[in-house]
Amino acid sequence: MMEDKITIEKLNLYYSDFHALHDINMHIQKNEITAFIGPSGCGKSTLLRSLNRMNDLVEGCRIDGSIKLDGTDIYNGDLDVTVLRQRVGMVFQRPNPFPMSVYDNVAYGPRIHGITDKKELDEIVETSLKQAAIWDDLKDRLKKSALGLSGGQQQRLCIARALAVKPEVLLMDEPTSALDPISTSKIEELALELKKNYTIVIVTHNMQQAVRISDKTGFFLLGDLVEFGETDQLFSMPKDERTEKYITGRFG
């Protein structure tokens, strides 16, 4: 039986007077890749950023309903948001390495969480870079600036940085949109490997990417979750006419 990692119930999100998400209900299961697709402005990134409360940083943002991580409402007032963001990591659209060495990029999060022992940090950096499938590329460049890496290397470094604090969920907001096809393929292969140990939620404009790597897909339109289900079924036999029109390119 599949285990729910994140449960979203009757979620409505507002930016001041703008109603951005309407009554979203969704079960995101452990050790799966869930893809959010839909045209620009449909709400998919807004929902993604709600899963670790990044939207808290947006003035006027408020929610009704609930998002539960392992059964605990993440919008509970007693919840430490820093701990939440350790458990639910994020990789952004454009690679955003810090202006410091490769090593210090990966060690940044563990240091914030109180790890100072060099041997322990060395192990975390090596393990995280190996998990991100970039250790062999960077093991001799650990003390060099991360800003000198290629775009694809920078994005895998950012994934390693997210993994260094041992998250349970990894959110990816269009992680390959700024990358070339070869780098994109490497990130997709990496995501498929990472789902063995992590739950992954990815926003993508690339529908074929959703087909290639995701187990479940949600199609969003104008703040509504139009359809959600097994990726193969959603793309081969969509239940909603709007989904069918979108995936066949008739709008979007």
UniProtKB/Swiss-Prot annotation:
GO molecular function, one term: ATP binding
Keywords annotated in UniProt: ATP-binding, Cell membrane, Membrane, Nucleotide-binding, Phosphate transport, Translocase, Transport
Bilayer topology annotation: Peripheral membrane protein
PROSITE patterns according to UniProt: ABC_TRANSPORTER_1, ABC_TRANSPORTER_2, PSTB
Compartments where located: Cell membrane
Keyword Nucleotide-binding (UniProt): yes
Catalyzed chemical reaction(s): phosphate(out) + ATP + H2O = ADP + 2 phosphate(in) + H(+)
Function: Part of the ABC transporter complex PstSACB involved in phosphate import. Responsible for energy coupling to the transport system.
Subunit structure: The complex is composed of two ATP-binding proteins (PstB), two transmembrane proteins (PstC and PstA) and a solute-binding protein (PstS).
UniProt protein name: Phosphate import ATP-binding protein PstB
Organism the protein comes from: Lactobacillus delbrueckii subsp. bulgaricus (strain ATCC 11842 / DSM 20081 / BCRC 10696 / JCM 1002 / NBRC 13953 / NCIMB 11778 / NCTC 12712 / WDCM 00102 / Lb 14)
